[in-house]
């Protein structure tokens, strides 16, 4: 579960290393975001000499959470970290690579470009 002020790792090579969630896109008073939700975040740590800089406000989609994800077949998936992929306004990733495993639920939510870049889909 991701809420405002939560720090997340970045799972792509867009230039950001760490994000802080400042808003959850969707209903006006959503408290938590889960895998596949789009958030507004600020970059807290960035790689030098890259297009994205520190304190820049961006959009990102959540690809991993520490909170368990329960599927319809009874399977429970839990990751070791909270991670997101930086996206543009159309929902396309800004980076060209995605690191780490991501959940299969992103394919149902039309983030197929992110799924195709991922090395492992659980």
From Swiss-Prot:
MF terms (GO), sorted A to Z: large ribosomal subunit rRNA binding; structural constituent of ribosome
Keywords, comma-separated and alphabetical: Chloroplast, Plastid, Ribonucleoprotein, Ribosomal protein, RNA-binding, rRNA-binding
GO biological process: translation
Top-level taxonomic group: Eukaryota
UniProt feature coiled coil, ranges: none
Record's GO cellular component terms: chloroplast; cytosolic large ribosomal subunit
Keyword Signal: no
Primary subcellular site in the record, as a coarse category: plastid
Subcellular compartments: Plastid, Chloroplast
A Pfam family reported for this protein in Swiss-Prot or TrEMBL: Ribosomal_L14
Secretion signal span: none
SMART domains named in the record: Ribosomal_L14
NCBIfam families per UniProt: rplN_bact
Family membership: Belongs to the universal ribosomal protein uL14 family.
Self-association and partners: Part of the 50S ribosomal subunit.
Reported function: Binds to 23S rRNA.
Protein name in UniProt: Large ribosomal subunit protein uL14c
Organism: Calycanthus floridus var. glaucus (Eastern sweetshrub)
């Amino acid at each position: 579960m991701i809420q405002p002020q939560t720090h997340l790792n970045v799972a792509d090579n867009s230039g950001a290393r760490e994000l802080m969630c400042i808003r959850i896109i969707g209903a006006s008073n959503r408290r938590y975001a889960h895998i596949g939700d789009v958030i507004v975040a600020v970059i807290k740590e960035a790689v030098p000499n890259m297009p994205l800089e520190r304190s820049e406000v961006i959009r990102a989609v959540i690809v991993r959470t520490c909170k368990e994800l329960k599927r319809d077949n009874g399977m429970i998936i839990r990751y070791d970290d909270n991670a997101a992929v930086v996206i543009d306004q159309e929902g396309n990733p800004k980076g060209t690579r995605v690191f780490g495993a991501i959940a299969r639920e992103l394919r149902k939510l039309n983030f197929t470009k992110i799924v195709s870049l991922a090395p492992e889909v659980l």
